[in-house]
Regions:
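As written
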Residues: 106-114
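Conserved phosphotransfer cores of two-component systems
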Residues: 47-52, 81-88, 109-110
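Conserved phosphotransfer microenvironments
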Residues: 55-82
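Conserved acidic carboxylate
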Residues: 7
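C-terminal output helix
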Residues: 119-130, 134
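Acidic, metal-coordinating helix/loop segments flanking the phosphotransfer/catalytic sites
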Residues: 34-57, 67
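Two-component/phosphorelay signaling modules centered on CheY-like receiver
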Residues: 10-35
Length: 139
């Protein structure tokens, strides 16, 4: 299983890596790639496309600095790009945004397989979310 995690907060990124490692500890050939920003994530995705490899799961923070050269304004745009170039990749957007309208807009425009609030889930619940998303369920 090949997983991409993108978050501009290194501490949160490392925590997510630990959670994902635990969630998929039985997975064969688990590979986790981390990116701290949209620019690095785009370069990583392009590299994987060039060598004909795909990510099985992308876990992406919504609020991140833009990568203007590729017109990636936030994690939502990054998620859309990832799904475009790797249509079989499952995606989860993490956000600290609490406004219902904005969450609805993310869900409708980006259409991630999972949408989670950073402040709203326990580790156990987050593990369940990403495991279910990989199995094809929506959250």
């Amino acid at each position: 299983m090949n997983i991409l995690i993108v978050d501009d907060h290194s501490g949160y990124l490392e925590s997510l890596k630990s959670i994902v490692t635990y969630a998929f500890e039985d997975a064969k050939n688990l590979k986790i790639t981390k990116s701290l920003n949209c620019e690095n994530a785009i370069q990583t995705i392009k590299h994987h496309v060039a060598i004909n490899k795909t990510f099985d799961l992308g876990i992406i923070d919504y609020i991140m600095p833009a990568y203007n050269e590729e017109e990636i304004n936030n994690g939502g745009d990054l998620c859309t790009y990832l799904k475009k170039v790797m249509p079989t990749c499952k995606t989860v957007i993490n956000t600290g945004i609490l406004e219902d309208f904005t969450l609805f807009e993310i869900d409708q425009k980006v259409k991630p397989d999972g949408l989670t609030l950073k402040s709203d889930l326990s580790v156990e619940d987050y593990i369940k979310v990403i495991q279910e998303v990989v199995q094809g369920k929506k959250f």
